[in-house]
Design a protein with these regions (language model features):
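N-terminal nicking endonuclease/strand-transfer module with a His-rich metal-binding environment
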Residues: 1-232
Length: 232
Protein backbone atom coordinates (compact mmCIF):
# COMPACT_ATOMS: atom_id res chain seq x y z
CA UNK A 1 0.00 0.00 0.00
CA UNK A 2 1.16 3.52 -0.79
CA UNK A 3 1.17 4.98 2.72
CA UNK A 4 3.19 8.09 2.00
CA UNK A 5 2.42 11.39 3.69
CA UNK A 6 3.38 14.70 2.14
CA UNK A 7 4.58 17.71 4.12
CA UNK A 8 4.86 20.99 2.20
CA UNK A 9 5.71 24.50 3.33
CA UNK A 10 5.62 27.98 1.78
CA UNK A 11 7.03 31.21 3.17
CA UNK A 12 4.99 34.41 3.52
CA UNK A 13 6.70 37.75 4.10
CA UNK A 14 5.32 40.42 6.39
CA UNK A 15 4.22 42.63 3.46
CA UNK A 16 1.80 39.95 2.26
CA UNK A 17 -1.61 39.86 3.90
CA UNK A 18 -3.14 36.53 4.86
CA UNK A 19 -6.79 37.56 4.72
CA UNK A 20 -7.51 35.77 1.43
CA UNK A 21 -5.77 32.64 2.67
CA UNK A 22 -7.75 32.77 5.91
CA UNK A 23 -10.98 33.28 3.97
CA UNK A 24 -10.19 30.08 2.10
CA UNK A 25 -9.62 28.27 5.37
CA UNK A 26 -12.96 29.65 6.58
CA UNK A 27 -14.75 28.84 3.31
CA UNK A 28 -18.39 27.79 3.34
CA UNK A 29 -20.50 25.67 1.00
CA UNK A 30 -21.70 28.75 -0.89
CA UNK A 31 -18.09 29.73 -1.67
CA UNK A 32 -17.33 26.79 -3.98
CA UNK A 33 -17.09 28.88 -7.15
CA UNK A 34 -14.32 31.03 -5.63
CA UNK A 35 -12.00 28.13 -4.89
CA UNK A 36 -12.86 25.34 -7.35
CA UNK A 37 -10.34 25.73 -10.19
CA UNK A 38 -11.30 22.47 -11.87
CA UNK A 39 -8.34 20.63 -10.36
CA UNK A 40 -9.11 20.62 -6.65
CA UNK A 41 -12.35 18.60 -6.94
CA UNK A 42 -14.21 20.42 -4.18
CA UNK A 43 -17.20 18.80 -2.49
CA UNK A 44 -19.08 21.79 -1.01
CA UNK A 45 -21.60 19.58 0.78
CA UNK A 46 -18.68 18.40 2.95
CA UNK A 47 -17.40 21.88 3.86
CA UNK A 48 -19.51 21.89 7.02
CA UNK A 49 -17.50 18.88 8.21
CA UNK A 50 -14.10 20.61 8.00
CA UNK A 51 -12.39 20.35 11.38
CA UNK A 52 -10.93 23.45 13.04
CA UNK A 53 -8.05 22.59 15.36
CA UNK A 54 -6.97 26.17 15.99
CA UNK A 55 -9.32 28.89 14.79
CA UNK A 56 -7.89 32.40 14.40
CA UNK A 57 -9.67 35.73 14.34
CA UNK A 58 -9.69 36.57 10.64
CA UNK A 59 -10.19 40.30 11.32
CA UNK A 60 -7.24 40.71 13.70
CA UNK A 61 -4.77 38.11 12.40
CA UNK A 62 -2.68 40.43 10.21
CA UNK A 63 -2.84 43.19 12.83
CA UNK A 64 -1.34 40.78 15.36
CA UNK A 65 1.41 39.96 12.86
CA UNK A 66 2.20 43.68 12.53
CA UNK A 67 2.27 44.07 16.30
CA UNK A 68 4.79 41.25 16.68
CA UNK A 69 7.05 42.89 14.08
CA UNK A 70 6.76 46.26 15.86
CA UNK A 71 7.56 44.65 19.20
CA UNK A 72 10.70 43.05 17.78
CA UNK A 73 11.83 46.31 16.15
CA UNK A 74 11.27 48.23 19.39
CA UNK A 75 13.28 45.75 21.44
CA UNK A 76 16.07 45.66 18.85
CA UNK A 77 16.32 49.47 19.01
CA UNK A 78 16.60 49.26 22.80
CA UNK A 79 19.74 47.11 22.65
CA UNK A 80 22.25 49.46 24.25
CA UNK A 81 24.92 47.03 25.41
CA UNK A 82 28.31 47.20 23.68
CA UNK A 83 27.95 43.58 22.59
CA UNK A 84 25.35 44.66 20.02
CA UNK A 85 26.31 46.15 16.67
CA UNK A 86 24.35 48.63 14.57
CA UNK A 87 23.09 45.64 12.59
CA UNK A 88 21.69 44.08 15.77
CA UNK A 89 19.80 47.29 16.54
CA UNK A 90 18.26 47.97 13.15
CA UNK A 91 14.70 47.09 12.19
CA UNK A 92 13.84 43.82 10.54
CA UNK A 93 13.80 43.95 6.75
CA UNK A 94 10.53 45.12 5.24
CA UNK A 95 10.24 41.78 3.42
CA UNK A 96 11.03 39.62 6.46
CA UNK A 97 9.36 36.21 6.32
CA UNK A 98 7.14 36.04 9.38
CA UNK A 99 4.64 33.30 8.46
CA UNK A 100 4.76 29.75 7.14
CA UNK A 101 1.88 28.10 5.30
CA UNK A 102 2.12 24.33 5.73
CA UNK A 103 0.08 21.48 4.25
CA UNK A 104 0.03 17.84 5.38
CA UNK A 105 -1.61 15.35 3.04
CA UNK A 106 -1.71 11.53 3.09
CA UNK A 107 -1.61 9.65 -0.22
CA UNK A 108 -4.87 8.84 -1.99
CA UNK A 109 -4.29 5.14 -1.39
CA UNK A 110 -3.84 5.69 2.35
CA UNK A 111 -7.07 7.70 2.39
CA UNK A 112 -8.93 5.01 0.43
CA UNK A 113 -7.84 2.34 2.91
CA UNK A 114 -8.82 4.27 6.04
CA UNK A 115 -12.01 5.78 7.38
CA UNK A 116 -12.64 9.51 7.57
CA UNK A 117 -12.30 9.25 11.36
CA UNK A 118 -8.85 7.64 10.96
CA UNK A 119 -7.79 10.38 8.55
CA UNK A 120 -8.92 13.05 11.02
CA UNK A 121 -7.03 11.25 13.82
CA UNK A 122 -3.82 11.18 11.74
CA UNK A 123 -4.05 14.84 10.76
CA UNK A 124 -4.98 15.90 14.29
CA UNK A 125 -1.89 14.15 15.62
CA UNK A 126 0.19 15.85 12.92
CA UNK A 127 -1.14 19.18 14.23
CA UNK A 128 -0.32 18.15 17.82
CA UNK A 129 3.22 17.23 16.80
CA UNK A 130 3.71 20.55 15.02
CA UNK A 131 2.28 22.41 18.00
CA UNK A 132 4.69 20.62 20.34
CA UNK A 133 7.74 21.43 18.18
CA UNK A 134 7.80 25.14 17.30
CA UNK A 135 11.56 24.80 16.77
CA UNK A 136 10.73 22.71 13.67
CA UNK A 137 7.41 24.11 12.46
CA UNK A 138 7.11 27.59 13.95
CA UNK A 139 4.47 28.72 16.44
CA UNK A 140 1.13 27.43 15.16
CA UNK A 141 -1.46 30.20 14.83
CA UNK A 142 -4.17 28.52 12.72
CA UNK A 143 -5.00 24.95 11.71
CA UNK A 144 -7.90 23.30 9.88
CA UNK A 145 -8.53 19.86 8.39
CA UNK A 146 -10.20 20.12 4.97
CA UNK A 147 -12.57 17.24 4.30
CA UNK A 148 -14.29 18.91 1.36
CA UNK A 149 -11.67 18.04 -1.26
CA UNK A 150 -10.90 14.72 -2.93
CA UNK A 151 -8.02 14.16 -0.52
CA UNK A 152 -8.36 15.27 3.13
CA UNK A 153 -5.46 17.41 4.30
CA UNK A 154 -4.29 19.63 7.13
CA UNK A 155 -3.60 23.31 6.51
CA UNK A 156 -1.51 25.17 9.09
CA UNK A 157 -0.33 28.77 9.46
CA UNK A 158 2.51 29.35 11.88
CA UNK A 159 4.68 32.27 12.92
CA UNK A 160 8.35 32.15 11.94
CA UNK A 161 9.32 34.94 14.34
CA UNK A 162 11.68 34.30 17.23
CA UNK A 163 10.37 36.67 19.89
CA UNK A 164 13.20 35.79 22.29
CA UNK A 165 16.09 36.44 19.91
CA UNK A 166 14.21 39.18 18.01
CA UNK A 167 14.54 37.77 14.50
CA UNK A 168 12.90 35.62 11.86
CA UNK A 169 13.94 31.98 11.89
CA UNK A 170 12.32 31.16 8.54
CA UNK A 171 15.64 30.11 6.97
CA UNK A 172 16.23 27.54 9.70
CA UNK A 173 12.63 26.31 9.59
CA UNK A 174 12.54 25.85 5.81
CA UNK A 175 16.17 25.53 4.74
CA UNK A 176 17.38 24.42 1.31
CA UNK A 177 16.27 21.36 -0.68
CA UNK A 178 18.47 19.01 1.33
CA UNK A 179 17.26 20.35 4.68
CA UNK A 180 13.65 20.20 3.48
CA UNK A 181 14.10 16.58 2.42
CA UNK A 182 15.50 15.73 5.85
CA UNK A 183 12.57 17.50 7.49
CA UNK A 184 10.09 15.44 5.49
CA UNK A 185 11.77 12.32 6.87
CA UNK A 186 11.65 13.70 10.42
CA UNK A 187 7.97 14.55 9.98
CA UNK A 188 6.97 11.09 8.77
CA UNK A 189 9.09 9.36 11.41
CA UNK A 190 7.48 11.50 14.11
CA UNK A 191 4.05 10.24 13.09
CA UNK A 192 5.30 6.65 12.90
CA UNK A 193 6.53 6.97 16.48
CA UNK A 194 2.99 8.02 17.40
CA UNK A 195 1.59 4.81 15.96
CA UNK A 196 0.60 5.75 12.40
CA UNK A 197 1.43 3.62 9.35
CA UNK A 198 2.90 6.35 7.18
CA UNK A 199 6.14 6.88 5.26
CA UNK A 200 7.78 9.96 3.84
CA UNK A 201 7.22 10.79 0.18
CA UNK A 202 9.71 9.94 -2.55
CA UNK A 203 13.18 11.24 -1.71
CA UNK A 204 14.08 12.86 -5.02
CA UNK A 205 17.50 13.89 -3.71
CA UNK A 206 18.71 10.35 -3.03
CA UNK A 207 21.31 8.79 -5.34
CA UNK A 208 19.10 5.73 -5.97
CA UNK A 209 16.18 7.90 -7.06
CA UNK A 210 18.32 10.01 -9.38
CA UNK A 211 19.89 6.92 -10.98
CA UNK A 212 16.51 5.25 -11.51
CA UNK A 213 15.03 8.50 -12.89
CA UNK A 214 17.85 8.76 -15.44
CA UNK A 215 17.41 5.09 -16.41
CA UNK A 216 13.64 5.46 -16.93
CA UNK A 217 13.99 8.69 -18.91
CA UNK A 218 16.48 7.01 -21.25
CA UNK A 219 14.33 3.89 -21.57
CA UNK A 220 11.02 5.65 -22.26
CA UNK A 221 12.42 8.83 -23.82
CA UNK A 222 10.20 11.00 -21.64
CA UNK A 223 10.82 13.31 -18.67
CA UNK A 224 10.02 11.69 -15.31
CA UNK A 225 8.36 14.05 -12.84
CA UNK A 226 6.55 13.71 -9.53
CA UNK A 227 3.31 13.78 -11.54
CA UNK A 228 4.02 10.71 -13.67
CA UNK A 229 6.69 8.74 -11.79
CA UNK A 230 4.13 6.26 -10.41
CA UNK A 231 3.43 5.01 -13.96
CA UNK A 232 6.93 3.62 -14.44
Amino acid sequence: MDNRIAYKVKKTNCKTGTKNLLKEMFREEKDQAKYDNGVRDLHPEMTQHNVWLEKPNIETFDKERDERIKEINKKRAERTSEEYTAYDRRKLRSDTVDMLSQVVQPSSEWINNHTREEAVALLTEAYNMMKEHPELYGEVKAAVIHLDESSPHLQVLSSALDMENLRSKAKELVGNKTAMSEKQTIFANGLKERGFDVERGVNRLSHNYKARKEYLENKYQTPITRHNEQKY
